[in-house]
From Swiss-Prot:
Membrane topology designation: Multi-pass membrane protein
Pfam families in alphabetical order: MFS_1 (PF07690)
Record PANTHER family: CHLORAMPHENICOL EFFLUX PUMP RV0191, PURINE EFFLUX PUMP PBUE
Ranges that cross the membrane: 4-24, 42-62, 69-89, 93-113, 131-151, 158-178, 203-222, 245-265, 269-289, 293-313, 331-351, 356-376
Record family assignment: Belongs to the major facilitator superfamily. DHA1 family. MdtL (TC 2.A.1.2.22) subfamily.
One cellular-component annotation, GO: plasma membrane
Residue ranges annotated as Periplasmic topological domain: 25-41, 90-92, 152-157, 223-244, 290-292, 352-355
Main location: membrane
Organism per entry: Shigella flexneri
Subcellular location: Cell inner membrane
Organism lineage: Bacteria, Pseudomonadati, Pseudomonadota, Gammaproteobacteria, Enterobacterales
InterPro entries: MFS, MFS_dom, MFS_Efflux_Transporters, MFS_trans_sf, Multidrug-R_MdtL
Keywords of the record: Cell inner membrane, Cell membrane, Membrane, Transmembrane, Transmembrane helix, Transport
Protein name: Multidrug resistance protein MdtL
Keyword set includes Membrane: yes
Amino acid sequence: MSRFLICSFALVLLYPAGIDMYLVGLPRIAADLNASEAQLHIAFSVYLAGMAAAMLFAGKVADRSGRKPVAIPGAALFIIASVFCSLAETSTLFLAGRFLQGLGAGCCYVVAFAILRDTLDDRRRAKVLSLLNGITCIIPVLAPVLGHLIMLKFPWQSLFWAMAMMGIAVLMLSLFILKETRPASPAASDKPRENSESLLNRFFLSRVVITTLSVSVILTFVNTSPVLLMEIMGFERGEYATIMALTAGVSMTFSFSTPFALGIFKPRTLMITSQVLFLAAGITLAVSPSHAVSLFGITLICAGFSVGFGVAMSQALGPFSLRAGVASSTLGIAQVCGSSLWIWLAAVVGIGAWNMLIGILIACSIVSLLLIMFVAPGRPVAAHEEIHHHA
């Protein structure tokens, strides 16, 4: 079992590492490529676009051909794209490399969640996804620090060589450690069960909405945090970094505590708690009389996401024993596209950073609470976790 957990964690971590590690070198990259920092900030969106594009096909291929045939090319593409970015001499080539990086990371991301669905029952999967969420929260803190240390001695290209080395590690794990977990091709008697695993299932769609809104909350916070903390609240850059590190600490603490909470409380209770924390955060930020109270509201955001997201993802994947790859892709596409659409629309309409965050917090909590209360899980899939895997 440990081999599946290690491989899944490694496959997932390419995604945040690809986002956060290069940011510290952005000014130097812009100077060398004769582009403005503003022009290169689109590299974040291009990377997410690559991930979304990968998810359009990765899940279906993983369900038909297996998890390894998607993970291995995905890791290889991430390596090649990282090297391509390091060799880029124009901003256009750099952005093309970032898109390819996103494609590779997206393939690995989809496979990681499919593997966890293949190998873990509902309760263990919820615990592992909560732990994974906590580990993922470390990357935005550690990656820029590692990038800074690298750039003390080496040029910005070394950041992408470091990402390539990470990709090589994931490729080696996928080649030599990971075993295939895709369920064996269903017999004729299993066809009705395969056909019953519909992406239009009300319970699955409710969890897609809940997880998409939750990701929209956390990405809205990350996207608006420089404006909120430095421009509106007046913190210096060093203080901003400290606050973001502390919020990551809050996220890790609650993520690592959630598996223990699942041994005491029902998953539904934790999901309701998560949304109540979001609602409390929105109200706190809306009526906040001081910076200290606002910072408390921000900690509630991190706590709410950490308590509920892993549980909701586990519930979303639960009904899919034979189509876990497609379900994972659908979740990923909805989360990436939904959150990006909200942030873009809010910017186009002219909603300020503060109101943007408050609005998504309150909307997410109200909609999600209604879905949790009124959309119950259906009948468990027969032979839910008793799947025969390929050797």
